[in-house]
Amino acid sequence: MANNFRTDRVGMEIKREVNEILQKKVRDPRVQGVTITDVQMLGDLSMAKVYYTIMSNLASDNQKAQTGLEKATGTIKRELGHNLKMYKIPDLTFVKDESIEYGNKIDQMLRDLEKK
């Protein structure tokens, strides 16, 4: 139980820090409009899966954002090392969060059902 609490707490802290780093430190225009929605940590805190959304729905913008985040991983890890009191900063993997689009799709289906 305590280990799960720790991974959740570290994940929330990484989420907050990565959002701040993307806004203030990363100058790559490909990551403009990217918001971190969730961070899932491995139990031993060695890896973090970082879920993000982007304002644009265009596939090309999604691919550019993914590429920009992958290129900025070193900068993000370095800044996390300065800001977090951890022995080892976890490896970061960026994954597009599809849950918001899925939720919007379900909302639209419900609205369509109401109209009938």
Curated annotation (Swiss-Prot):
GO terms for biological process: maturation of SSU-rRNA. SUPFAM superfamilies: Ribosome-binding factor A, RbfA (SSF89919). Keywords: Cytoplasm, Ribosome biogenesis. One of its GO terms (cellular component) is cytosol. It holds the Pfam family RBFA. The keyword Cytoplasm applies. Gene3D superfamilies: 3.30.300.20. It is found in: Cytoplasm. NCBIfam families: rbfA. One of several proteins that assist in the late maturation steps of the functional core of the 30S ribosomal subunit. Associates with free 30S ribosomal subunits (but not with 30S subunits that are part of 70S ribosomes or polysomes). Required for efficient processing of 16S rRNA. May interact with the 5'-terminal helix region of 16S rRNA. Belongs to the RbfA family. PANTHER family: RIBOSOME-BINDING FACTOR A, CHLOROPLASTIC-RELATED. Monomer. Binds 30S ribosomal subunits, but not 50S ribosomal subunits or 70S ribosomes. This is Ribosome-binding factor A. It comes from Streptococcus sanguinis (strain SK36). The lineage of its organism: Bacteria, Bacillati, Bacillota, Bacilli, Lactobacillales.
